[in-house]
Each structure stands twice: as structure tokens, then as C-alpha cells.
Design a protein with these regions (language model features):
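Central regulatory/effector-binding core of bacterial HTH transcription factors
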Residues: 1-63, 129-131
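Immediate post-signal peptide segment of exported/extracytoplasmic ligand-binding proteins
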Residues: 1-4, 94-98
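Short, well-ordered beta-strand segments
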Residues: 3-7, 55, 79, 102, ...
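Short, surface-exposed acidic/glycine-rich loop or hinge patches that mediate macromolecular interfaces
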Residues: 11, 38, 108, 181-182
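A late-sequence structural motif
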Residues: 15-16, 88, 163-205
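Hydrophobic hinge/microswitch elements
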Residues: 39-52, 57-58, 107-161
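Secondary-structure junction motif
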Residues: 58, 86-88, 93, 99-121, ...
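Beta-alpha-beta core module
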Residues: 63-70, 74, 132-183
């Protein structure tokens, strides 16, 4: 009857939770999961206090008492609806800048990696919509000529047309974090192992496509 509290985005939920619950139904049907999104600056405090068992996020500057391993890595692509006027094999920087963009971020303000890369080139994209949720973006994309920069795995899952980015940005890394006080806890270690194995399977499946 153990309940695990995990901080993650809706993007990570969509990748991790379906295969996790397939596994839990077989191995531990009474285990419960509570998913939420903690503020990044509070991750260490929440893990240390036991209010979170795990956090799944990009690389963070955390306390030395917080352990972590990399779960997933995915490259970013420019995604749009199928049939979009710019749905082709390659985009120039000028074509990318001509698009009306959705920017996904849980923060109220701040630039994304694409914007930082464009800024170094003296360029700026047009962000028409800033949203917290990836899932919402797919609905807007399918009904408009807007574009969104998302991980390749997400674009495939939602049948979006994807084009390589015309600017170089680092891939998205997702790490799993836990507090050292739970490092040897049998339940915590078992759940950690399940999520690491699931991430390995997701990675292998993507590489096989």
C-alpha cells in the first residue's frame, strides 16, 4: 500500500506513467503514485523533508545530499501539423523565424534554449503563446499554422510533423532525483530500479525506430 510522491512535468508523465502502471499492475498492484510539479528551487527541501520521494527534471543544481542519475535524453525538433506550408525536410533559420511559435515553460518568464541560441545570432523568434503544458500545445498546433519546439519523442507520440532545428541546442536530459536518506530504503530503491528500467526500454524502442 505504499504511495510514492513524484514531481514531474506533463511531458514526463506521458512518457513514464503508462509503462510504469503496466509494470505495477503485474508486480505491485497496491502501489499508488501521486504526481505533482514542485518548484525547482524547492526540490532539495521537498526531498529532504520526505514530502517528495522522487523528482524527475532537467539537470539541477541540488544539495550534495540529493542523488541523481540520468534517465532519458532526447533531441529537440520543430513540430507542426501535417500539411503545414513549411512541413518539409529542412528549415532555414529565416523560415523558422517566420513561424508563429508556442513556448512551453512552467516559469512565468525567461528564455528557452532556442531563444538563447538565436540571441547569439542576433535573432529573435515570434512567440505568440507561452504555456505551461505540452499536451495543450498539440491541440493548438493541429488547428493552426503555429509551430512548437519539442522533444522528438513527444512529436512522434502525437503524430506531429517534425523538422530538424536550424539552430544547435543541447538535447533534453531528464534525471531522477532522490534524497540520500532514502538511498538504501528497500521500497525507494525498488521503485527507482523500475523507473530506470522503463527509461532504458523507452530509449531502446526509440533507437529501434
Amino acid at each position: 500500500n505504499k504511495t510514492f510522491r513524484i514531481s514531474m512535468t506533463d511531458l514526463t508523465e506521458a512518457v513514464v506513467l503508462p509503462p510504469l502502471f503496466q509494470r505495477l499492475r503485474r508486480l505491485a498492484p497496491n502501489v499508488k503514485i501521486e504526481s505533482m510539479l514542485a518548484k525547482r528551487r524547492e526540490t532539495t527541501k521537498e526531498l529532504a523533508a520526505g514530502r517528495l520521494d522522487f523528482a524527475m527534471d532537467a539537470p539541477l543544481n541540488t544539495d550534495p545530499q540529493v542523488r541523481h542519475v540520468k534517465l532519458l535524453e532526447d533531441r529537440y525538433v520543430c513540430a507542426m501539423r501535417r500539411g503545414h506550408p513549411l512541413a518539409k525536410d529542412k528549415l532555414s533559420v529565416e523560415e523558422y523565424l517566420s513561424l508563429s511559435h508556442i513556448h512551453i515553460s512552467s516559469r512565468r518568464s525567461g528564455l528557452g534554449m532556442v531563444d538563447l541560441a538565436l540571441g547569439k545570432m542576433g535573432q529573435q523568434r515570434k512567440i505568440a503563446l507561452r504555456s505551461q503544458h505540452y499536451m495543450m500545445a498539440t491541440q493548438v498546433i493541429q488547428q493552426t499554422d503555429m509551430a512548437v519546439t519539442v522533444p522528438e519523442r513527444f512529436a512522434r507520440r502525437h503524430d506531429l510533423y517534425q523538422v530538424p532545428l536550424p539552430v544547435d541546442i543541447p538535447p533534453l536530459e531528464t534525471h531522477i532525483y532522490w534524497h540520500e536518506s532514502t538511498d538504501q530504503d528497500p521500497a525507494n530503491r525498488w521503485m527507482r530500479e523500475q523507473m530506470i528500467e522503463i527509461a532504458q526500454q523507452v530509449t531502446a524502442a526509440q533507437q529501434a525506430d
